[in-house]
Amino acid sequence: MKIDPIRNRLYTLTVLSCYLVLTPNMLSKLAFNALHGMKEYISELIQFKKLNSLNSENNEWGEITNDSKYEINILFIGEMMRSDYLNVYGYNEKNTPFLSSVNGTFVHNFYSADTHTVPSLRIMLTYQGENSKIEPNYPKSFINAANNAGYDTYWISNQGLIGEYDTPISFIAKSATHKYFIKLHDNNAEDHDMLKVINYYISKPSKKKKLIVVHLFDSHGYGSLCDQNKKFMTENKLLKYSETNKKDVECYSSAVTKTDKIISETYKTLNSKNIKFSIVYFSDHGSSESTDNAGNIFYKHEDNDKAGYKIPLIRITSDDT
């Protein structure tokens, strides 16, 4: 991979700034992390080059019988949401008012394939079969399976992208019949902005059953979106939010409440249609709670922490009463 320092001014300025302000010890850690990240990135580029040599509709599933009774199926894919921070899974803050009140299936002790989005979802969204080596099988993605089963497939995403098809996950999304990437249209989009697109696809006339995938930004942006998320905080949460070391905790918890609200609004829309439906939610990975030198709690990716893998898996259907 070739980086042109003249064209990549931001990259050059970042490197120079690091050398000016960081200590030797910090630089050594930064260099190690940078090399590790570069190695992973190059590996992804090699794999993605192989992906681009394939047609996204290259489908190895064969004929699949569609005997599901549900006319509309919604799959919410969350981001960085660990299950023990949801009230419905036992968290002490009442941050899931809808999920805690509705009947459904709530799976405990469910774990993601990785602690980062792409490595996790490329495994979780493709068929592994009997292979002892766990690796993505893109021609056998779940979207291709739904297409073969005769579903009308939709993919709505609030994940920030350079282009629609520049990651393995967006490559899977490309196989959907209908695609809408919110952040290609609005860089400041919130997950709530997807509700109008979800409602449009729910109401869109179709002779087929529907699979609608909604890829949320979820709690991944808990810090940058915290001011927006204040409207989801109770008075008790706002009080804790004023405590410096509790700020990120309440931001993270309010992101959970926002997702709960989105699922609730979608449920209400589907329920008003008097149709058979299914809603599934899971997160791509969890997060690890950590503390900085000042005692402030924050969340990060951590391969060696079980919490980085522990995620919610929820299913709610029109049959649940």
Which residues fall in each region the model found?
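Transmembrane and membrane-interface helices of multi-pass
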Residues: 1-34
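Short beta-strand segments
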Residues: 155-157, 211-218, 253-256, 278-283, ...
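Active-site-proximal alpha/beta segments of enzymes that process anionic O-linked groups
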Residues: 25-239, 308-310
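Non-catalytic, well-ordered alpha-helical segments in soluble enzyme domains
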Residues: 147, 318-321
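Active-site-flanking alpha-helical
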Residues: 86, 267, 291
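A short beta-strand-to-alpha-helix junction
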Residues: 133-138, 246-259, 301-309, 321
